[in-house]
């Protein structure tokens, strides 16, 4: 079962008490769908999954499923601090109608590649649900390409990967290794989106699409149409935005950008210093001007 398209990784709005803000979430999802994304992905790094309890995350899953029309796709990240919680999230996601699950590797503690292979195999076989490996080495144990390919070949329910490693060499390696296999290859690093699509990958899950979905949807469409000049132009615009987002902690820049666009997602998770306040103000001023001159 291949999953194709451009998916927005969704931030998790909260109120001033840190509770899931359902009305703002609904507005955010409507904003993303109106911009033309093929679906949404919740529960990933952009959604700040380590901050939320399982019950809170299940509430987000059900809210997302209720907002999506039949022609859009729901993907759900099920990373957590334990196998037990990961399995609970996977069961809830599939019951709610998710098309596939994003399975990040364990966070915080370091493991060997054999441990990661055992983990992914156990979770996917227990859930008996389509799982996309989620390589997120900045925040979890990284998956070696050899481990990824072994899991794709050997595990029935490991159907693909969202590669957020940023390793350009993986783009061609995984595309070449597919060789007729029905694997789903999704770009997870926005800087490599056009490179992945041009190499035959099936789409992308984009954090930047959460705050600028029209740009990412246009870039994906341009790649599909084979318009090399427009693809290059839009990728350059995307890289301009990524360069401005990168100095912020993940995913602060995306949430700050949403606020500048009239979709505030609640307080940031740490106290804000005066220097950070100035940085935020400068970025939001830049963003408003940049948006006025970005033709998609």
PLM features: what roles do these ranges have?
Residues 72-73, 131, 159, 182, ...:
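Secondary-structure boundary/capping signal
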Residues 8, 21, 42, 46-50, ...:
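Short, flexible micro-motifs
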Residues 25, 57, 61, 86, ...:
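A general structural signal for well-ordered alpha-helical segments in protein cores
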Residues 22-29, 117, 145, 277-287:
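Short, amphipathic alpha-helical "lid/cap" segments that border enzyme active or binding sites
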Residues 2, 7-11, 31, 35-37, ...:
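C-terminal alpha-helical cap/extension of soluble enzyme domains
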């Amino acid at each position: 079962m291949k999953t194709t398209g451009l998916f927005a990784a969704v931030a998790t709005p909260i109120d001033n008490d840190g509770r899931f803000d359902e009305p703002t979430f609904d507005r955010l999802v409507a904003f993303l769908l109106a911009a033309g994304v093929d679906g949404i992905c919740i529960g990933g790094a952009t959604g700040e999954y380590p901050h939320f309890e399982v019950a809170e995350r299940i509430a987000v899953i059900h809210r997302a499923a209720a907002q999506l029309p039949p022609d859009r796709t729901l993907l759900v990240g099920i990373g957590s601090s334990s196998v037990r919680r990961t399995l609970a999230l996977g069961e809830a996601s599939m019951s709610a109608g998710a098309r596939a699950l994003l399975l990040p590797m364990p966070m915080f503690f370091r493991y060997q590649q054999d441990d990661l292979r055992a983990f992914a195999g156990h979770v996917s076989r227990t859930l008996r649900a389509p799982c996309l490996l989620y390589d997120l080495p900045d925040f979890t144990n990284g998956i070696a390409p050899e481990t990824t390919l072994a899991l794709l070949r050997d595990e029935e329910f490991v159907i693909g990967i969202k590669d957020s490693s940023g390793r350009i060499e993986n783009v061609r390696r995984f595309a070449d290794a597919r060789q007729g296999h029905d694997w789903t290859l999704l770009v997870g690093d926005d800087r490599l989106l056009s490179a992945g699509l041009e190499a035959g990958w099936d789409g992308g899950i984009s954090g930047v699409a959460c705050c600028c979905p029209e740009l990412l949807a246009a870039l994906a469409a341009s790649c599909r149409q084979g318009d090399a000049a427009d693809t290059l132009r839009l990728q350059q615009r995307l890289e301009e935005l990524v360069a401005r987002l990168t100095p912020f902690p993940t995913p602060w820049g995306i949430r700050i950008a949403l606020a500048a666009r009239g979709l505030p997602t609640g307080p940031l998770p740490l106290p804000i210093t005066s220097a950070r306040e100035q940085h935020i103000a400068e970025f939001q001023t830049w963003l408003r001007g940049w948006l006025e001159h970005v033709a998609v």
